[in-house]
Amino acid sequence: MLKKPTVLLILVLAGTWLAYTFITGLIPDETQITWLVEGMQEDFNNGAATGVGKGLSADFEEEAYGLDKRGLVLGLMHVMRQERASDGTFPLRAEIRDTHQITVHQTDPRTADVTVLVEFTRLRRGASQDAPPKALGLLQFDGKCRYENGSWRFVSSTHEVLEGRRPF
């Protein structure tokens, strides 16, 4: 027979899960996808490749480089390790331009197309730290998202360089 603390813990966990499910059901899909993109941007700026990978489905495919989820995360880890400064900071930055488009499919509301413009810059080091970041490139990312296991994840993406160059 279960003791009172165990039963109480089970009830709290079940209540938390039900509240989370109810609340996320009230938030529009477009908002949830925007939060996903912003979270991936924040993880990139913090130099957290595995954090970026959390926004990708297990069967993710990056079409421009032909990478799966594991390959993309490992590639980001390599770039982040190479670029990291001696003080541990990651100098590359990704900034989402205000213009992005999210279209949830009417025929299959668990899928969506996402287009995001991302400007990549490099923070200045040393004496020129007060100078504005160095512009590297403006890229357009086009991706497909799927709602799975209670959250949105990218299942595929590709990108095009609009200005400058690829940052890595």
Predicted regions and their residues:
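Soluble, non-transmembrane catalytic domains of enzymes that act on hydrophobic metabolites at membranes
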Residues: 44-51, 90, 159-164
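Short, flexible helix-adjacent loops and helix caps
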Residues: 45, 61-65, 126
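Residue-level detector of secondary-structure transition/capping positions
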Residues: 41, 60, 80, 120-122
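Short, solvent-exposed loop/turn segments at secondary-structure boundaries
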Residues: 24, 64-67, 129
